Amino acid sequence: MGDKAGTRVFKKSSPNCKVTVYLGKRDFVDHLDQVDPVDGVILVDPDYLKERKVFVTLTCAFRYGREDLDVLGLSFRKDLYISTFQAFPPIAEERKANSRLQERLLKKLGQQAHPFYFTIPQNLPCSVTLQPGPEDTGKACGVDFEIRAFCAKSIEEKIHKRNSVRLVIRKVQYAPEKPGPQPMVETTRSFLMSDRSLHLEASLDKELYYHGEPISVNVHVTNNSTKTVKRVKISVRQYADICLFSTAQYKCPVAQVEADDQVSSSSTFCKVYTLTPTLDKNREKRGLALDGKLKHEDTNLASSTIVKDVTNKEVLGILVSYRVKVKLVISRGGDVSVELPFVLMHPKPTELPISRPHSAVPESDPPIDTNLIEFESNSFSQDDDFVFEDFARLRLKGMADDEDC
């Protein structure tokens, strides 16, 4: 039997090791027309279960204040969405076809394992973390998704950390396959005591950029006025629309260039400036929007948010966008500036895990998918097909161990 890569499965157990949750992935992609389903398996010790039921909840929450300020029953957190699934005993009308991964896990784990399934609504925001300050402790502000599994006689029963499993997943978006048109903007400015005007034209080399990719800004100035351009300032700005009780917008420069390029009266000027917005140069900026964090992985600037219906006022959370600002500093005449919107995202991975009903797979000659279980009748040890990885969340500075998800 040749060597082959096993199927990665993330798992996390309760502190008392009586409840364990298994998931095939941690990132669930928003494709705009639908979101990847959240399907997993929960394993419960039968001696511990007794007469109780098994519940799994999916919560999307927006934390908008420091955790240490949660006093007197007041919490700076708003639950945007809560869904509950009763895994055992199963409810007939909630039963759905198991995915291939669920079928394989159920076969491996035995009769004490139970499948669960959630559908994430499309109007929920993507996972975004607001960068904490040096003195901030506890959970960072932002939007996150959490799965919680526990045993109880009813859903209203108080849940204890010792016998429940909490793990954080992410709702993410990837760059569209077809980028938009090349951004270009122009403006003309007239000045007092000057018969002629100044014309500024700016453009980007494309509309879609991947994280870490340099941005080329083409600046063309035709100065027919009597004024002189003293300096040129180029900046990349992140805009975060906080949509909760009301809508507020916060902007933060993430890359900037200032050049002493002068444009005299009755002359033209053309130059390409290059900027690369990265988190490494902005780690001290409190409140900067970042992609949601998982495990012990570093993150990056928050990806641009793509909204399917821009007129939908029910979208809550943090909506992120980016613009390049080109500013000309004029001698004794004020400033002339334009803005160019662009999209900053991760490319779509070549192979994404896909959750499909087991019944949808043909019985003969199934397509090979490295992200799914391969059913083999001649396998000596099907257990070797699994690579279990503990499910953990990036531990922020000052965060207690029991909050590590």
UniProtKB/Swiss-Prot annotation:
Tell me, which GO biological process terms does this entry list?
A: G protein-coupled receptor internalization; nervous system development; positive regulation of ERK1 and ERK2 cascade; signal transduction
Write out the entry's keywords from A to Z: Cytoplasm, Sensory transduction
Keyword Cytoplasm in annotation: yes
Q: Where is the signal peptide?
A: none
Query: What molecular function does GO assign, one term?
Result: angiotensin receptor binding
Q: What is its main location?
A: cytoplasm
Q: In which domain of life is the source organism classified? A: Eukaryota
Among SUPFAM superfamilies, the record links this protein to: E set domains
Q: Where in the cell is it found?
A: Cytoplasm
Which Pfam families does the protein's record reference?
Arrestin_C (PF02752), Arrestin_N (PF00339)
Q: Which SMART domains match?
A: Arrestin_C (SM01017)
Cite the InterPro entries for this sequence.
Arrestin (IPR000698), Arrestin-like_C (IPR014752), Arrestin-like_N (IPR011021), Arrestin_C-like (IPR011022), Arrestin_CS (IPR017864), Arrestin_N (IPR014753), Ig_E-set (IPR014756)
GO cellular component, alphabetical, reads: cytoplasm
State the PROSITE patterns in the record: ARRESTINS
Q: Family assignment?
A: Belongs to the arrestin family.
What's the protein here called?
Arrestin red cell isoform 2
In which organism is this protein found? Oncorhynchus mykiss (Rainbow trout)
Lineage, top ranks: Eukaryota, Metazoa, Chordata, Craniata, Vertebrata
